[in-house]
Regions:
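TRNA-recognition modules of translation machinery and tRNA-sensing kinases, especially anticodon-binding
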Residues: 1-218
């Protein structure tokens, strides 16, 4: 079943212009320090080595974003090359506390489909809407599109140390996402403090058998 799902989503992403990547399962701590994960997500990572005693420290990847952005950085690009869409079926590792583990929705190793887009400002609206369309297509094919809720996950300005970037950029980005969701006529709630440390996001959630919402797509 996993192989069929992987083949299906990869074929669909390729049709939509995604470039397939295959990135390592771990990296030196240097990469995570550049991306901000070392300062803001280290407790959720499996770290290999000790910074005080070892010359090199590695960590298993908790997400693919630093790796795919490094793929982009490895070559020189013109603005004419954009948008660039990277897709990967990624096996990830997160050092979840035992009390946070839950069924197959909160585990320490899992495989998901990840995509990262490099776009010009004038391309942002179209690319965002195309991402939502891809998510909705997947939900429709899997037969769960009627059971989901949409959430604009925002930063908490009263907890600034949790995030990177300045307030103006955060507020502008949240306003752009809000406007695009409204243009798509998608009902959504706004959840303060649920953003990633690096930016706001749209979470697509579904209720499990216990009535608790789990995030299916971000």
């Amino acid at each position: 079943m996993m192989q069929e799902l992987q083949r299906w989503i990869e074929d669909e992403e390729t049709k939509r212009g995604y470039i397939r990547t295959k990135t390592p399962l771990m990296a030196k701590s240097d990469l995570y320090k550049i991306s901000g994960h070392w300062d803001h997500y280290k407790d959720g990572m499996f770290v290999l080595g000790d910074e005080e005693t070892d010359k090199e420290v590695f960590a298993l990847r908790p997400m693919t974003c630093p790796f795919q952005y490094y793929v982009y950085k490895a070559e020189q690009h013109s603005y004419r090359d954009l948008p660039l869409r990277y897709g990967e079926t990624s096996t990830l590792f997160r050092n979840e506390d035992s009390g946070e583990m839950h069924g197959l929705t909160r585990v320490r190793q899992f495989t998901i489909s990840e995509g990262h887009l490099i776009v010009r400002p004038d391309q942002m609206v179209k690319e965002f809407k195309d991402c939502i369309a891809l998510a909705q297509y997947c939900l429709q094919v899997l037969g769960v599109e009627e059971d989901v809720t949409y959430h604009l996950s925002k930063w908490d300005p009263n907890n600034r140390e949790k995030y990177i970037g300045d307030a103006e950029v955060w507020n502008q980005t949240e306003a752009h996402i809000r406007q695009m969701l409204e243009e798509l006529n998608i009902p959504f709630t706004e959840d303060v403090g649920e953003a990633a440390f690096y930016g706001p996001k749209v979470d697509i959630n579904a209720k499990n058998v216990y009535g608790k919402e789990d995030t299916m797509i971000t």
